[in-house]
C-alpha cells in the first residue's frame, strides 16, 4: 500500500480503498462469525431436545434449525448445499425410523 500524500485541502481526507476493504472485511467476518455461532447453538439445543425425546421440543427445534439455515443462505453465510445438508441431518436425527 502506498503511503498517503499530504493534501492541501481542508476537511475530511479520503481513505485509501485497500484500507477501507480491510476494515469492511473485518466487520463482515465478525458478523458472519456471530451468525455461525448462533447456528451452532441452535443445533446444540436441537440435539439436546432429541436426546430428551420430547416430541414438542423436537418439532420446535427442527423448525428453528430449518429457519436459521435458510436465513444463513439468504445472508450469504452458507451456500444452499450446506444448508440443505444441515437440514437433512437434523431431519434424520428428529425421526431416525422414518
Swiss-Prot record:
GO terms for biological process: translation. Transmembrane segments: none annotated. NCBIfam families: S20. InterPro entries: Ribosomal_bS20, Ribosomal_bS20_sf. It comes from Chlamydia muridarum (strain MoPn / Nigg). Residues 1-12 have a biased composition (Basic residues). GO terms for cellular component: cytosol; small ribosomal subunit. This is Small ribosomal subunit protein bS20. Gene3D superfamilies: Ribosomal protein S20 (1.20.58.110). Belongs to the bacterial ribosomal protein bS20 family. Disulfide bonds: none annotated. The keyword Ribosomal protein applies. Keywords: Ribonucleoprotein, Ribosomal protein, RNA-binding, rRNA-binding. The gene is rpsT. One of its GO terms (molecular function) is small ribosomal subunit rRNA binding. Binds directly to 16S ribosomal RNA. Residues 1-34 are annotated as: Disordered.
Amino acid at each position: 500500500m502506498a503511503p498517503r500524500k499530504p493534501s492541501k485541502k481542508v476537511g475530511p481526507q479520503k481513505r485509501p480503498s485497500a484500507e477501507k476493504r480491510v476494515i469492511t472485511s473485518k466487520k463482515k467476518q465478525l458478523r458472519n462469525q456471530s451468525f455461525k455461532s448462533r447456528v451452532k447453538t441452535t443445533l446444540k439445543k436441537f440435539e439436546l431436545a432429541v436426546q430428551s425425546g420430547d416430541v414438542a421440543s423436537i418439532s420446535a427445534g427442527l423448525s428453528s434449525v430449518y429457519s436459521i439455515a435458510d436465513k444463513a443462505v439468504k445472508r450469504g453465510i452458507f451456500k444452499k448445499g450446506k444448508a440443505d445438508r444441515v437440514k437433512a441431518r437434523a431431519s434424520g436425527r428428529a425421526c431416525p425410523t422414518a
